[in-house]
Amino acid sequence: MAKIKAEYIWIDGHSPTPKLRSKTKIIDGPVSELSQIPEWSFDGSSTLQGVGHNSDRAMRPVDFVPDPIRGGEHILVMTEVNYPDSTPHKTNKRVNLVDVVKRHLAHEAWFGIEQEYTFFRGRSPLGWPEGGYPAPQGPFYCGVGADEVFGRDIVERHLDACLYSGIGISGVN
């Protein structure tokens, strides 16, 4: 059996805007089913999800996709955060969403995910005047041209990576 890289990804405890975290585990591959991916742990005191004397947190895999950066049989593993006893951690908002979706299956909800981007140079958004603000959004919203849009090459690479991995994305702005 070959060894592959599984990049475990989770949402941390920062508020009001949580951050993504990840770490790599070497596992047996190739992987074809979620059940082949083991749970793993991390130090929650470093991610605002625990305190020093009680900081072990569990990552339970909930989905996986091909890794568009590493290629081959390597995978990205989406996880939810639990306490060591397998109960959902207070920052695990996914568990609430799963409950809502199950209760309202008959409504056949639709979701369209569009990725929007803000690139920074230092502490300011790229293209903004030093210490100031740009013109109103109108001219550069869904803009075209080097004077309106920055980082389009990164946007295209990200979109290609999502499509390669089978991640549902319906467009970019």
Model-derived regions: residue spans:
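Glycine-rich, acidic/polar active-site loops that bind/position phosphate-bearing ligands
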Residues: 1-173
